[in-house]
């Protein structure tokens, strides 16, 4: 069947190409050096057919290249600003129509629905009888009352919209988030999702499977990712200066922000998810975070973080996969991540109080590199088993180099440094 369908599609395309080559091979649009949108690269009034539906897609003329955007992309920017401050969602049935400039709500209007994202003042000004009003991120159904008016609320909706703001109320740029990071001015991207979700739905309920239980399971996961992520972000970033929750729903999330806060967010999400699921060992999450310069394209950062997430899910240790976190390309189990974060905080305190120099950090990085090099070299040998490689790596040059460097550091810190050495070597945490 699939082969027949592909053949039919190819035959149709061939016939069109023979009868009207322009529809297949173009040219499309009008070209020109400065008439396209800098965001989506669309030319004015493209794709073809918009005019036939009463729609236009102008590209704003602007002296600054960054401001040259089409009506759709500009409307998405306005949508993001409204979502960040949303208090109510208003749904209104209208006659299906298409007219004016192409914007984010044009598709909804074509389907006979208008959606408004408003605060309380706008709601009171625009509300009409018959509108459906949903309260955002506040599970209450009491009506809105002000100025002698009463607006009924029919439902509530969780909306993961945690957004960082500047002092003037504008949404912070990626450069601001990067500069607000601890240490190096980079931003981080974080992707996370629930492990084995398909298996969870197909096998997790066993003989107790029913439509209502399946729906409850789905709603419970959505409630965590859509309703609770805002709370987690607020606790980590009370001044809304570091984290931007771009998406969270169903069983996964995407967030960006100051790199140190992004790592903390990943740890906190995993911790709270375990509490939410009563520490059920069958319900786990994996994550991946990437590190980028402030000019790095956001969509590419999301892709890189997604690739790191997949690597974390595929990472094997002790015969199991998933339930892991990929920190800038290095897969770790969650316990090791917490251990590393604890030592990061301690070493940062030493640096702040001049108890060690920055060279100390570079020495540790060099030792880790030595460990990786010898591990890769031994792993290429076919005469050694995986267990033999692991045992030999633990007695190579990096070990006595570590002991030597730590012994030369501040005498006041020797007790802590000895513990660090024991944990690195005894628990095989040099990565």
Q: Across the structure, where does each feature detected by a protein language model lie?
A:
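Charged, helix-rich terminal subdomains or tails
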Residues: 1-431
């Amino acid at each position: 069947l699939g082969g027949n369908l592909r053949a039919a599609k190819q035959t149709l395309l061939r016939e069109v190409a023979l009868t009207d080559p322009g529809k297949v091979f173009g040219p499309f649009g009008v070209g020109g050096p400065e008439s396209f949108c800098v965001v989506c690269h669309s030319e004015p009034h493209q794709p073809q057919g918009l005019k036939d539906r009463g729609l236009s897609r102008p590209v704003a003329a602007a002296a600054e290249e960054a401001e040259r955007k089409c009506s759709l992309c500009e409307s998405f920017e306005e949508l993001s600003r409204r979502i960040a401050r949303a208090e109510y969602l208003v749904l209104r049935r209208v006659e299906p129509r298409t007219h004016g400039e192409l914007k984010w709500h044009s598709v909804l209007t074509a389907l006979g629905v208008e959606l408004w994202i408003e605060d309380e003042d706008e709601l009171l000004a625009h509300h009409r009888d018959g509108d459906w009003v949903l309260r955002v991120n506040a599970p209450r159904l009491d009506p809105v009352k002000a100025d002698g008016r009463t607006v009924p609320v029919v439902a509530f909706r969780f909306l993961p919209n945690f957004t960082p703001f500047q002092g003037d109320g504008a949404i912070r740029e990626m450069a601001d988030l990067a500069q607000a990071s601890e240490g190096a001015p980079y931003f981080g991207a974080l992707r996370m999702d629930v492990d084995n979700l398909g298996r969870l739905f197909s096998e997790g309920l066993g003989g107790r499977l029913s439509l209502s239980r399946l729906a409850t399971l789905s709603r419970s996961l959505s409630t965590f990712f859509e309703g609770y992520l805002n709370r987690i972000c607020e606790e980590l970033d009370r001044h809304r200066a570091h984290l931007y929750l771009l998406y969270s729903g169903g069983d996964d999330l995407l967030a960006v922000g100051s790199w140190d806060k992004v790592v903390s967010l990943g740890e906190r999400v995993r911790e709270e998810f375990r509490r939410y699921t009563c520490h059920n060992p069958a319900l786990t999450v994996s994550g991946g975070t990437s590190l980028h310069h402030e000019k790095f394209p956001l969509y590419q950062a999301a892709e890189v973080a997604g690739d790191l997430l997949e690597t974390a899910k595929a990472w094997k240790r002790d015969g199991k996969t998933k339930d892991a976190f990929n920190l800038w390309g290095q897969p770790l189990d969650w316990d090791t991540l917490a251990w590393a974060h604890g030592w990061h905080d301690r070493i940062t305190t030493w640096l702040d109080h001049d108890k060690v120099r920055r060279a100390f950090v570079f020495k540790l990085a060099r030792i880790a590199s030595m460990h990786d090099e010898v591990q890769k070299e031994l792993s290429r040998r076919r005469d050694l088993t995986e267990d033999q490689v692991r045992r030999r790596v633990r007695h190579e040059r990096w070990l006595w180099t570590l002991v030597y460097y730590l012994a030369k550091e501040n005498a006041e810190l020797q007790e802590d440094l000895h513990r660090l050495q024991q944990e690195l070597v005894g628990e095989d945490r040099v990565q």
